[in-house]
Amino acid sequence: RQIADGLQKGRLSKQSAGKGSRAWEETAALEEHLQSCLAKAYEYRDNHFATHPEYYACYFEMRLGQCEILDSLQEEMGRLRRFPVQAEAVAEILAYVAEHVMERNEPAAQLERLGRLLEDMKRSPLPVSREEFENRAVLYHILMELEEFLKLKKKFVELLTEEQVERYWGKPERQDEKSFRK
């Protein structure tokens, strides 16, 4: 969320996005917490005869993968020298995705919105300077990383059984039942 805010305001710097920044420290703390949760999930799996002991282990593995992508996103943000016009739209989608990071979420809507943004960027005029080209390339790479972030969640959701969805998610919060389950 902090990265999206900095990008929107055009005030992202090495201090706000790079190593040692508050966002970086929060991501490191999150990663440490997820590692602890994953260890507990493995312990739970290994000590229970429950019908779905893998759920928590798979969930925290997915979140750790997403955490690695957050690290990469922060590094990319630190490479921006100037903020192209497209930075505003990238900040908006980052903020939008941040609002929807929750356990019971199927990311189809976020992937669709990201796809529309990528199409819009393809239609924008070509950069006129090398610096603009490089900064737009960084933004594009950020969007590719964001797509991977969402695809990790999508894969997790697709691998859930109906029983796991019912047990851990209760009544599914899905926009389209058919898109959720094959």
What do the predicted segments below correspond to?
Residues 18, 44-47:
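Surface-exposed beta-loop-beta
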Residues 1-23:
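Canonical alpha-helical transmembrane segment with a positive-inside/aromatic-interface signature
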Residues 3-8, 38, 45, 51-182:
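Soluble C-terminal extramembrane regulatory/interaction domains of multi-pass membrane proteins
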Residues 26-37, 66:
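Alpha-helical segments in soluble extracytoplasmic regions
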Residues 18, 22-25, 85, 134:
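A general boundary/transition motif marking the beginning of the first structured unit of a protein
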Residues 2, 25, 32, 61:
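Conserved active-site and cofactor/substrate-binding residues in soluble primary-metabolism enzymes
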